[in-house]
């Protein structure tokens, strides 16, 4: 069991900042506490960036602290403007209800039997006059506008609706502290201003000191957010990002980002990580395979991780060096294969498909009218056991 969680988070490059760091360190060592992590259900799945916070919540839970997970079923109706240039898409309430239901299942999958709240339970009880009178007096608009949470939107035209987001999230912390003795909020580093707003509200209304802790965002070595794919994000739901595509994302990760990803997302010993990340040339493939397997296992379980690993090796190992062909999306598959002389005739192509003798990335082609779909990764078209064609799709 960990004895010094803050030190561990720093060693694993998870720690960004905390208010009253020394006091928080003692607070977590001296007794078991209630803490909370929040997620707005703006999609029907969590993504890999969210998993960083789940990972930290699990570490604290294993130390004996009690997690309270807050799903923003009310705040999702407004949308967090933090770091955004454009106004968020306004979601229908029925969509948020559906998203909340699926995310609850994911939370339980990763954290087990934990306390899950929906903030509409308390936020819907507030009336507007009460918000302005009882909460608004504790917020300086000048200070709010100076934070990173609003600066990007300010240039484009910040709405009153968005301005209220910080107040409502601060009230979440206030409510949980008052009713559940929650003394710590954990969020991504982009949530620092919102977390401090909640801590300050509690201090001014209740004269109590609470803590905020932020985690580093999961980014590549070049600063780009990790997890961007052709589907928009690296989703934890296999129906949105297949287990194979999830596995392959880590296989294709740039070499410079490997060590940080190992540290942030796995519990592998640091010495082992150093050894793996010091491998050079073709041997670095072993490092990527280890990373891909460990993270896929965390999210999807050992069985599916092994299946993805085996499929990846089957598709990509021992292949001859082939030219990568650029293909426009929406191209008819049979027409393309005949044009490139990969298959002699359309009749042969139809026969291969009917006999399940043609695959794309190890998936049988079953539709005689199949078109070539856009994929971020390379696609390996296999005819029989030994004939391959490697393609990369480009938008028409």
Swiss-Prot record:
L-tyrosine binds at residues 36, 165, 169. It comes from the Bacteria. A motif ('KMSKS' region) lies at residues 225-229. Keywords: Aminoacyl-tRNA synthetase, ATP-binding, Cytoplasm, Ligase, Nucleotide-binding, Protein biosynthesis, RNA-binding. The keyword Cytoplasm applies. Catalyzes the attachment of tyrosine to tRNA(Tyr) in a two-step reaction: tyrosine is first activated by ATP to form Tyr-AMP and then transferred to the acceptor end of tRNA(Tyr). NCBIfam families: tyrS (TIGR00234). This is Tyrosine--tRNA ligase. It comes from Mycoplasma genitalium (strain ATCC 33530 / DSM 19775 / NCTC 10195 / G37). The gene is tyrS.
């Amino acid at each position: 069991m960990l004895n010094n969680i803050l030190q561990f988070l720093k060693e694993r490059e998870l720690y960004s900042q905390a208010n009253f760091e020394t006091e928080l360190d003692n607070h977590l060592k001296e007794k078991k506490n209630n803490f909370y992590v929040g997620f707005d259900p703006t999609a029907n799945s969590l993504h890999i960036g969210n998993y960083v916070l789940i990972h930290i919540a699990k570490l604290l839970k294993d130390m004996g602290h009690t997690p309270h997970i807050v799903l923003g079923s009310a705040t999702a109706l407004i949308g967090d403007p933090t770091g955004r240039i454009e106004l968020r898409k306004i979601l229908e309430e029925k969509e948020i209800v559906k998203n909340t239901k699926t995310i609850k299942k994911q939370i339980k999958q990763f954290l087990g039997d934990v306390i899950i709240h929906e903030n509409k339970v308390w936020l819907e009880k507030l009336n507007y006059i009460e918000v302005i009178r009882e909460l608004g007096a504790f917020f300086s608009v000048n200070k709010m506008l100076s934070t990173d949470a609003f600066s990007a939107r300010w240039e484009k035209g910040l709405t009153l609706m968005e301005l209220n987001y910080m107040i409502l999230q601060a009230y979440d912390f206030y409510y949980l502290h008052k009713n559940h003795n929650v003394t710590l909020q954990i969020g991504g580093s982009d949530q620092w201003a919102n977390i401090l707003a909640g801590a300050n509200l509690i201090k001014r209304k209740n004269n109590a000191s609470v803590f905020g802790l932020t985690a580093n965002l999961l980014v590549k070595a070049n600063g780009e957010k990790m997890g961007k794919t052709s589907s928009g994000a690296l989703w934890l739901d296999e129906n949105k990002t297949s287990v194979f595509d999830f596995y392959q994302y880590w296989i294709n990760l740039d070499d410079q980002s490997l060590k940080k990803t190992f540290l942030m997302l796995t519990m592998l010993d640091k010495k082992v990580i150093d050894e793996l990340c010091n491998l050079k040339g073709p041997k670095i493939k072993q490092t990527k395979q280890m990373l891909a397997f460990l993270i896929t296992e965390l999210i999807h379980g050992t069985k599916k991780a092994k299946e993805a690993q085996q499929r990846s090796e089957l598709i990509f190992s021992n292949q001859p060096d082939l030219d990568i062909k650029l293909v426009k999306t929406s191209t008819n598959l049979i027409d393309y294969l005949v044009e490139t002389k990969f298959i002699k005739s359309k009749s042969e192509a139809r026969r291969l498909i009917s006999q399940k003798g043609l695959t794309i990335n190890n998936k049988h082609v079953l539709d005689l009218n199949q078109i070539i779909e856009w994929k971020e990764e390379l696609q390996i078209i296999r005819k029989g056991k030994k004939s391959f064609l490697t393609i990369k799709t480009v938008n028409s």
